[in-house]
Each structure stands twice: as structure tokens, then as C-alpha cells.
From Swiss-Prot:
Its main location: cytoplasm. GO terms for biological process: cytoplasmic translation. This is Large ribosomal subunit protein eL24. Residues 123-140 have a biased composition (Low complexity).
């Protein structure tokens, strides 16, 4: 059994009831009764007519029991391990005093700077000796005479 919906009121239309209205542009409307059809043809807005489903939806009629059922989901904070650090390590770091953390940070920075200085110091002595040998072997540059072309006469082609 196929049940249609009224295009105006929104009520169900059971088989053997209602009317069909086909507009010239090919759109077909189903109406429950002559009352709905005449209201539609008079271009009345179903949202402003008290007995239609659209009016009841717009003005939130008969939805009081649904409001009680609705429950919103709350976001819950959850602590878990991250790649490369277990939950125990993270909690230990978090529970440390700020002074201890600051001291550790400064020590790590100092160690990194010292390592960088040592790396640069190892690089520097080797570099000047290589440069000195190339400086003595280099010959002075001689300027090449520029080839002067004849002036172009005529257009582009």
C-alpha cells in the first residue's frame, strides 16, 4: 500500500483518497482534499495556516516529549601515551617543578652549543691549509678582448 504526502498540508494520503494536480511545467502535486487544493491554488503559505504540518513544525508544536529524550555527548579528556614517550614519562615531566625543568633545558642548550663549537673548531684548521695551497698556484686573470660585431642595419628580419 503506497501512502502519499499532501503537497500542501503534509498529511498522509491513503489509496483511493485525494486529488492530483499537474501543472503546465510538468510538476505534479498531491492534495488530501479540496480544502488543501483550493488553499494551494490561492497561493496561501502552509507555514501560516494553523492546521498544517509545516505550521506545527515551524512553531514547535507537539515536540515536548522528544526534547526530554535528546542527550548531548560531552567531550571527555583522556590521557594516553604519544609515540616515543610513555604515559609515565609524560606525567613525570609534567609533575616536575619549573626550576628543575628550566635547569635541564639550559643544560641541554649548553651541551648543544659546545658540540657545535667543537665541530666548527675541527673544521677551521683544515680549511685554511687547503686555501693557502690554491692561492699560490693560481695565475692572474687576463682580460679577453671582446669581439665587436658590426652594427645591425635594417629591421627585425
Amino acid at each position: 500500500m503506497k501512502v502519499e504526502l499532501c503537497s500542501f498540508s503534509g498529511y498522509k494520503i491513503y489509496p483511493g483518497h485525494g486529488r492530483r494536480y499537474a501543472r503546465i511545467d510538468g510538476k505534479v502535486f498531491q492534495f488530501l482534499n479540496a480544502k488543501c487544493e483550493s488553499a494551494f491554488l490561492a497561493k496561501r503559505n502552509p507555514r501560516q495556516i494553523n492546521w498544517t504540518v509545516l505550521y506545527r513544525r515551524k512553531h514547535k508544536k507537539g515536540q515536548s516529549e522528544e526534547v526530554a529524550k535528546k542527550r548531548t555527548r560531552r567531550a571527555v579528556k583522556f590521557q594516553r601515551a604519544i609515540t616515543g614517550a610513555s604515559l609515565a614519562e609524560i606525567m613525570a615531566k609534567r609533575n616536575q617543578k619549573p626550576e628543575v625543568r628550566k635547569a635541564q633545558r639550559e643544560q641541554a642548550i649548553r651541551a648543544a652549543k659546545e658540540a657545535k663549537k667543537a665541530k666548527q673548531a675541527a673544521k677551521k684548521p683544515a680549511a685554511p691549509s687547503a686555501k693557502a695551497s690554491t692561492k699560490t698556484a693560481q695565475k692572474p686573470k687576463i682580460a679577453k678582448p671582446m669581439k665587436i660585431s658590426a652594427p645591425r642595419v635594417g629591421g627585425k628580419r
